[in-house]
Amino acid sequence: VYSTYLYVHRRVLEDGYDARIVSGVTSFCAAAASLSEGLVENSEELHVIPASYQIEDALEFSGTKVLMKAGKKMPAVKQFLKEKNCRAVMVENCGMDTEQKYFSAEEIPDQASYYSLIIVKEKRKK
């Protein structure tokens, strides 16, 4: 979960400095809280997926999918979400003054920041 930070962490250690990893609130948990939503319920599964790679197969997984760092490939990601008729919400810059929330694939802009994540939930049966 500390993927990007670990690159910096290793370099700091290699340069002879002391560094520690301190636990905190993950961005996808903060985004769900900002949306006043849980990520999963009961026996649902949670999948955290880097959106900068192929997501097509991953969106077939059952449960909730979190697409991390979705900004780079946003037009392709949006198109795929629309084609699959996914229930998707996006939080951009979670916890920052510039935080934005989008509540459907149609609302999500084609250009988004590095700090954009999309939560894809299965549609509930009525």
Where are these regions (language model features)?
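Class I SAM-dependent methyltransferase SAM-binding "motif I" and its flanking Rossmann-like core
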Residues: 1-61, 109
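A contiguous loop/helix-start segment that scaffolds small-molecule binding in enzyme catalytic cores
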Residues: 59-126
